[in-house]
């Protein structure tokens, strides 16, 4: 039996025990450390002015499951990663000089990290660490310590939260108002861990003799200047910021032997594409977002709205017609209570917006909305916002308590009226240790689970316990990291006992050209044993993400994260500071031969072997606003898929080229 061969349940229990113990141990950890790491450069050139693109705002591009690549942090080469810089690491011969806002030159080297990503590209991703870098530190240790404390408290961005350009801009504005700050900017970097980002605040201090509180910052923006050079900022002052949103994408996609060359068995409709199918997709998302303070109080209100137009030109692998669709994408509002110097922060928002829990194992920001049928651009996946959300977030130092209500934006022909309620307790010490415990319930849903006798059980009443643990560095070894997560599912209306989880180990090689990184992940999701009275098939909920939980760009289209195990090996290199190449190998196999609830052709498996897939992703940042991405994949059907089609199958080849824009 597969469970016995691979020790799945034993591994899952280990993840559970490890995560829960970490939660209890860390809950009583002291809070003596600063909330953000700090480092001091020996010598540097002063910042002349914060970069314009270091203060981006609003809901923008979120690359879809079929095109977003896994985050991988560049490791030290000529420059060092944000979280590891110290005074001795910064060469005085390589000053961190920043160009003026009008500069068109390439971003200069800085002592924080190699690969910098646009703030809007990282929106919604978990923050692994927050780093504060003082370029011209004081010679007085006590004054320096106090400056760092005030910078961390004023910025307000904490490790463990989900990155928001809107709130990062608000925090930067607070930092720039400090009497000892000459100039400041924040930057966003990839992490060596998958699916998380690092935030760096870069600050230049005023001379010690200059300490007066600055006057109000003159308003700026297109409304004030009437000039296009201020795009996308409409209006910015000390307490307010309003920006235009303009996201978009265009791509060419080509599949050879879609549905493993046998659409009669595996395609979700009567359309049967054969041979090579090539088509184009596009989308455009204009909108508006802003934040403003209420008087001199610590209360801020914010919101955003956008409209997405998408299209598919020529037949794709789902339908024969060209189609175009437009609808509201984001429409949300909220308020933030954040008093400078107070570790207690509260944030409440509601409406159409994105949401991601942890690394997307149960809830991914790419699965909030369906992108099929009439909505067009299925591979580009431009729609990600949930139809309705209510999100609350309470933070105190290293601790975070999050509550959420979610209602996915499903297709009308397949609307299950599913609603999710959840609460999550998190500890993140900004030193590489994160422990999370989450509870999720489903108070409403018409979706059902199919049993061998034809009976159906409803998803309504489903409950999930979800612990998670992340360690970086592992055992104090630079570049070595670990992630583990587990989910136990039960239902208060009938006997259900399903489980899923993963163990993920990775290593980023230090001080080597191209900064290679390696990782291995074993993941498992239980299937239902028809001989027991308990229902055991795992429900993947809203998991997604091309290099996270789709588990194969082609295999994932015919087999989801239920009744399956997978081995995944990743190898990533970065030939230069703007270019990343990532190669993934997946091998997937089933837990049980009973697969009711899966693809109609795979309801009863004749083998545990599901298939293999190789996935190559290349990303090249043309600038802080444009990304060129290429994807290539070849999926080989396993014995179970071949036998379901009477051995009439072929490898499924996918090629994609996309250009994304985000302002």
Residue ranges and their predicted role:
Residues 1-12:
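N-terminal secretory signal peptides that target proteins for export/translocation
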Residues 228-231, 342-346, 371-532, 610-614:
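Signature for the C-terminal beta-barrel architecture of outer-membrane proteins
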Residues 15-27:
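Bacterial N-terminal signal peptides
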Residues 256-265, 312-319, 360-367, 406-420, ...:
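Outer-membrane beta-barrel translocator domains and adjoining extracellular loop/strand segments
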Residues 104, 214-348, 394, 467, ...:
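Beta-barrel outer-membrane channel/assembly domains of diderm bacteria
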Residues 485-487, 495-574, 578-582, 589, ...:
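Extracellular/periplasmic loop regions
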Residues 191, 249-257, 306-312, 353-357, ...:
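Structural signature of outer-membrane beta-barrel domains
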Residues 3, 28-300, 518:
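N-terminal periplasmic/intermembrane-space "pro-region" immediately following the signal or transit peptide
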């Amino acid at each position: 039996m597969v469970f016995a061969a691979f020790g799945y349940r034993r591994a899952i229990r280990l993840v559970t025990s490890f995560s829960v113990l970490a939660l209890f141990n860390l809950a009583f950890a002291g809070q003596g450390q600063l909330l953000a790491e700090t480092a001091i450069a020996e010598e540097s050139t002063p910042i002349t002015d914060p970069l314009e693109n270091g203060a981006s705002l609003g809901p923008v591009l979120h690359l879809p499951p079929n095109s977003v690549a896994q985050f991988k942090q560049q490791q030290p080469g000529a420059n060092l990663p944000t979280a590891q810089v110290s005074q001795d690491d910064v060469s005085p011969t390589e000053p961190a000089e920043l160009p003026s806002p009008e500069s068109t030159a390439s971003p200069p080297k800085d002592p924080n990290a190699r690969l910098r990503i646009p703030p809007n590209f990282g929106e919604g991703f978990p923050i692994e660490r927050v780093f504060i870098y003082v370029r011209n530190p004081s010679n007085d240790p006590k004054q320096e310590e106090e400056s760092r404390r005030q910078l961390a408290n004023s910025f307000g961005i904490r490790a463990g939260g989900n990155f928001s350009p809107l709130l990062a801009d608000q925090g930067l504005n607070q930092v720039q108002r400090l009497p000892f700050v000459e100039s400041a900017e924040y930057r966003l970097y990839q992490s060596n861990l998958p699916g998380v980002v690092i935030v760096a605040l870069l600050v230049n201090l005023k001379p010690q003799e200059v300490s007066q509180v600055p006057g109000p910052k003159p308003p700026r923006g297109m409304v004030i200047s009437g000039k296009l050079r201020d795009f996308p900022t409409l209006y910015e002052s000390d307490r307010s910021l309003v920006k235009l949103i303009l996201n978009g994408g265009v791509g060419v996609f080509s599949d050879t032997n879609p549905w493993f060359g046998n659409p009669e068995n595996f395609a979700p409709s009567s359309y049967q594409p054969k041979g090579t199918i090539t088509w184009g997709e596009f989308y455009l998302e204009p909108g508006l977002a802003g934040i403003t303070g209420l008087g001199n109080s610590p209360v801020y209100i914010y919101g955003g709205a956008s409209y997405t137009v998408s299209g598919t030109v020529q037949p794709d692998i789902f339908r024969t017609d060209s189609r175009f669709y437009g609808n509201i994408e984001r429409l949300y509002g909220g308020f933030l209570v954040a008093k400078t110097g107070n570790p207690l922060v509260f944030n409440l928002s509601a409406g159409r917006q994105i949401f991601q829990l942890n690394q997307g194992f149960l809830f991914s920001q790419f699965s909030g909305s369906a992108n099929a049928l009439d909505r067009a651009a299925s591979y580009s996946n431009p729609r990600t916002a949930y139809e309705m959300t209510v999100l609350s977030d309470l933070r105190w130092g290293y601790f975070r308590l999050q509550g959420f209500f979610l209602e996915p934006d499903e297709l009308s022909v397949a609307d299950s009226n599913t609603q999710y309620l959840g609460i999550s307790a998190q500890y993140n010490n900004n030193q590489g240790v994160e422990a999370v415990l989450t509870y999720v319930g489903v108070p409403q849903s018409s979706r059902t689970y199919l049993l061998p006798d034809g009976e159906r059980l409803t998803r309504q009443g489903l409950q999930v316990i979800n612990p998670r643990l992340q360690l970086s560095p592992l055992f104090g070894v630079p570049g070595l990291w670990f992630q583990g997560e587990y989910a136990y599912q039960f239902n208060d209306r009938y006997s259900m006992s399903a489980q899923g989880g993963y163990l993920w180990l990775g290593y980023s090689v230090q001080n080597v050209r191209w900064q290679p990184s390696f990782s291995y992940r074993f993941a498992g999701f239980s299937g239902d044993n028809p001989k027991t009275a308990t229902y055991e098939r795992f429900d993947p909920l809203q998991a997604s993400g091309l290099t996270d939980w789709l588990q194969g760009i082609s295999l994932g289209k015919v087999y989801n994260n239920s009744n399956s195990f997978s081995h995944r090996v990743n190898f990533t290199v970065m030939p230069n500071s703007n270019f990343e190449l990532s190669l993934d190998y997946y091998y997937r196999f089933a837990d049980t031969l009973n697969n009711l609830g899966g693809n109609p052709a795979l309801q009863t498996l004749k083998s545990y072997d599901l298939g293999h897939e190789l996935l190559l992703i290349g990303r090249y940042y043309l600038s802080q606003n444009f990304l060129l991405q290429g994807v290539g994949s070849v999926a080989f059907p396993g014995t179970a898929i071949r036998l379901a089609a009477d051995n009439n199958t072929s490898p499924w080849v996918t090629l994609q080229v996309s250009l994304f824009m985000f302002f």
